[in-house]
Amino acid sequence: MQTTETQIMPNRFSFIRKRLRQKVIANLLMLLVLIPVGFLIAMPFMWMLTASLKVRGHMAEGPMLFPATFDFSNYVTAWQGAPFGRYYINTIIVAFGIVVSRLLIGSMAAYAFAILKFKGRDFLFMAYMTTMMIPFYAIVIPLYLIIRDFSWFNTYQALIVPRMVDAFGILLLRQAFIAVPKDYIDAARIDGCTHWQILWKQIIPLSLPTILTVSIFNFMFAWNDFMWPFLVANDTHMRVIQTGLQAFSGRYLTEWTYWMAGTVMTTIPPIVLFLFAQKKFISGLSRTGMKA
């Protein structure tokens, strides 16, 4: 018996050492791939940040991680060269309106497609999902004519109302709602909860990671949107951050340091938002596995 145990223990230890060695090698290989890829992804932003800190007229210098001299006055000049404060306020208002409306409407639609039972539900859902294949450019002229007929040019309504519904967000929310255990829903019905109460007191709290993921997607969309705001709200007092940056770049076309400083100011908020919410963002995506 003792001889058998002494034979098993070395074999077990050698197996563990072998598995640990394989794991270390796999992690090293992964790092060897991820570090260069991460550097390539971050390089454009690093170049933009470096260019924004260079002294005016030194843009022709070769690329470097840090400039020889830091010139933070480029940011002051860029901020004073255009009403970026107003652009930020407009963009935040528009982004808030789009995010809230898409969450409110999307949650109700996703609840209907995931929880309610009615004839033709799956067909309606698939028909609605096909709208994701229609490019925005195919409907931009009808939308533009509607905004003109309503006299909504250079208003928040023109920037928010056409963007209040999002099929992709409804898809993510529906998948999250389907994953909620039916026992919770049945218990809420036994307690006499209405559909509205079930949605807001049971489904939404259990789907917060997905709610946050959809919110981040919608915020990024609103923050980066250029074409539609450029068409319907191009007055100085109604410009959002992207159209404001375009107007600023037209004014300082040859001043690359100022242009890069303005670009950095427009990219910082989404980056900061994602850094703080990335764990919830990834968790929300992992929870929305495609379930029938």
What are these regions (language model features)?
Residues 1-21:
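Short, Lys/Arg-rich, polar N-terminal cytosolic tail immediately upstream
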